[in-house]
Amino acid sequence: MAHKGLQLLGFTLSLLGLIGLIIGTIMPQWKMSAYVGDNIITAIAMYQGLWMSCAYQSTGQQQCKVYDSVLQLDSALQATRALMVVAILLTVAGLGVASMGMKCTNCGGDDKVKKSRIAMTGGIILSVGALCSIVACGWFTSQIIRDFYNPFTPVNTKYEFGAAIFIAWAGAFLDIMGGGMLASSCSKGQSSPNYPKSSRPVKSSRPPSSSKEYV
């Protein structure tokens, strides 16, 4: 049967991954202004996230602006936003399904094989959600690298990785590890017990004896 400790560990990792995905999606520090070349002015630090852009001054003041129109955003940012939202929703759904199939819960009936299969289904959903977040983070990362090394990009508009993208990466890997543990915890099922075949007496094919005993 499914190992209880493996299920608990997988569920915990996926839950931590969900927290990381939510924090990473909300934070505006997906990319930050890079101070390269002649761009050494550090009085203002620019950050851009999936939902807003912020400017931090050396005095401690902060100004953030939410993106007004979706149509003004580039395709990479729109795809990253959509994939991260889908990843969070799938992770929440996967945790709900997996919790019903875990051995330490009373949901999903008393059939242990059925419960382990439910836990496996939840693990698969979690893995799909993690893959969505990995694709989103990878896409955004490649966009930052491509713009940074593009010779036609002005120096004052070059960006490097922010803290949010690392948190999102960590959440994605925790999610996929937890989903893999839950998916691999399914048992193969119980085979029907093999009862010994009942041995029937072999009937004799000889005709009954016609001899009679005489006194």
From Swiss-Prot:
GO cellular component terms, semicolon-separated: bicellular tight junction; plasma membrane
Entry annotated with the keyword Metal-binding: no
GO biological process: adherens junction organization; bicellular tight junction assembly; cell adhesion; cilium assembly; epithelial cell-cell adhesion; establishment of epithelial cell apical/basal polarity; otolith development; pronephros development
Membrane topology of this protein: Multi-pass membrane protein
Biased composition (Polar residues): 186-195
Domain of life: Eukaryota
Segments of skewed composition (Low complexity): 196-215
Summary of the function given for this chain in its UniProt record: Plays a major role in tight junction-specific obliteration of the intercellular space.
Protein's name according to its UniProt entry: Claudin-7-B
Species per Swiss-Prot/TrEMBL record: Danio rerio
Highest classification ranks of the organism: Eukaryota, Metazoa, Chordata, Craniata, Vertebrata
Gene name of this polypeptide: cldn7b
